[in-house]
Regions:
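Short, well-ordered beta-strand elements
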Residues: 5-8, 77-81
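Hydrophobic residues within well-ordered alpha-helices
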Residues: 20-21, 75, 125-126, 182
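Paired acidic/hydrophobic, glycine-rich loop segments that form the ligand-binding mouth/hinge
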Residues: 26-31, 48, 131-136
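An extracytoplasmic/periplasmic, membrane-proximal ligand-sensing/linker region
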Residues: 163-165, 169-230
Length: 230
């Protein structure tokens, strides 16, 4: 785009939402639920512009090191780890799908823990701190590829249905011409060009596609049913 970019690190999901709302950030990479929180906090002005093609069909993986666990029903009476409480793929959507399968984590599991991060969930399960856990598929694949998880010990036993997840969101009061420029720059990224592929590889993206607010209505409904949104 030719624009100067200043990277602003944030401490957690809530800080990203607040920074967008208070105009400290113009553009942010958000999980689906964090986007919904940003939309609510900014009175509907935060705009999702693009997502990776993979984010339109995102999934989470349920993992275990316990040979007795083969299905979600086997989780009854077991210890379980989610990621961060407000993580779309590490907590909210897996919880929603568990409930659709008739499982209430707080009632049906022996204990429920929050590891705080996807890779930490794998560590919990590998170390026996939890009988099973759930994390986003992208992180699981990355850990497997980099041999940071022993797949002879920790294995996937279930996968969620697909849902929309991560996106790049802009604050809505940015100049529309700048928003269009940013969106077009993402959509123009071509993996056949090495300099473009280097950028895309950082986000494990095969390509970027346009997205819109209504794609996240399902996540908003899941957040309300979980009591995480008013």
């Amino acid at each position: 785009t030719g624009m100067k970019v200043v990277f602003t690190p944030v401490s957690d999901y809530a800080a990203v939402v607040e920074s967008l709302a208070t105009k400290k950030l113009d553009l942010a990479w958000l999980g689906g639920f964090t986007y919904v929180q940003a939309k609510i906090r900014t009175n509907g002005t935060a705009i999702p512009i693009v997502q990776r093609a993979e984010d339109a069909v995102f999934t989470s993986k349920f993992i275990t090191a316990d040979p007795a666990i083969k299905t979600l029903a086997d989780l009854k009476g077991k210890t379980f780890a989610f990621g961060a409480p407000s993580s779309t793929s590490g907590s909210l959507m897996p919880r929603f799908f568990l409930q659709q399968d008739g499982l209430n984590p707080e009632k049906d599991f022996k204990t429920v823990a929050y590891s705080g991060a996807h890779d930490a969930t794998v560590a919990f399960v590998a170390a026996g701190k939890a009988d099973a856990g759930v994390l986003n598929t992208s992180v699981w694949d990355k850990l497997v590829e980099s041999k940071k998880v022993d797949t002879s010990k920790v294995r996937v036993f279930a996968t969620t249905p697909t849902y929309f997840d991560y996106n790049w969101t802009v604050r809505g009061d940015l100049d529309p011409a700048i928003i269009k420029k940013l969106k077009d720059a993402f959509l123009a990224l071509d993996p056949s060009k090495p300099e473009h592929k280097a950028i895309m590889d950082l986000q494990r993206a095969s390509k970027f596609v346009a997205t819109e607010s209504k794609n996240y209505d399902g996540i908003e409904a899941a957040g309300k049913s979980a009591g995480l949104l008013k």
